[in-house]
């Protein structure tokens, strides 16, 4: 990554997805490996003054709860992901879990909630968007 950033003037790196990046260390657990990868990416972003976006899976238990809206605690295999990140954005599609209505009472059909679960320098919050499942596209909610 260092070489690519310096020779190609890259300002953004995307990792799809974090749990697939291997970091082998004797006697370490998978959680420790993912933690080390998250910390290494954070340090690399600072060192090279670039943005790194790392996609991560959620724990499978999210869909088995009464409230399937994801939280920071649902990040798979590491609490270090939350610690190392400046911003954590979670995507929640209630329709995927068989939920008919959003928290505000509007129809959950073709909707997605973007959850800003952590936002160093930007704060936290949520925004509801439209979601066109057939083409995997987010749109203004009003255009659905």
Locations of regions flagged by a protein language model:
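Walker B catalytic acidic pair
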Residues: 17
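Catalytic P-loop NTPase motifs of RecA-like helicase/translocase cores
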Residues: 21-22, 61
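DNA transaction DNA-binding modules
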Residues: 11, 20-21
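…and closely analogous acidic/polar surface helices at protein-protein or active-site interfaces
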Residues: 34-38
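C-terminal regions of RecA-like/P-loop NTPase motor modules
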Residues: 1-13, 27, 39-49, 60-144
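Conserved ATPase-coupling elements of RecA-like P-loop NTPase cores
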Residues: 22-29
């Amino acid at each position: 990554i260092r070489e690519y950033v310096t020779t190609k003037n890259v300002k953004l790196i995307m990792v799809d997805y974090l749990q697939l990046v291997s970091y082998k260390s004797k006697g370490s657990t998978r959680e420790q490996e993912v933690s080390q990868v998250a910390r290494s990416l954070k340090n690399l972003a600072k060192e090279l003054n670039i943005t790194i976006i790392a996609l991560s899976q959620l724990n499978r238990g999210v869909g088995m709860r009464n409230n399937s809206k994801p939280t920071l605690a649902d990040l798979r295999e590491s609490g270090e992901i939350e610690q190392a990140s400046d911003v954590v954005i979670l995507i929640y599609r209630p329709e995927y879990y068989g939920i008919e209505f959003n928290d505000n009472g509007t129809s959950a059909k073709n909707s997605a909630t973007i959850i800003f679960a952590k936002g160093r320098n930007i704060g936290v919050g949520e925004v509801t968007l439209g979601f066109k499942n057939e083409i995997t596209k987010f749109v203004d909610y009003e255009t659905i």
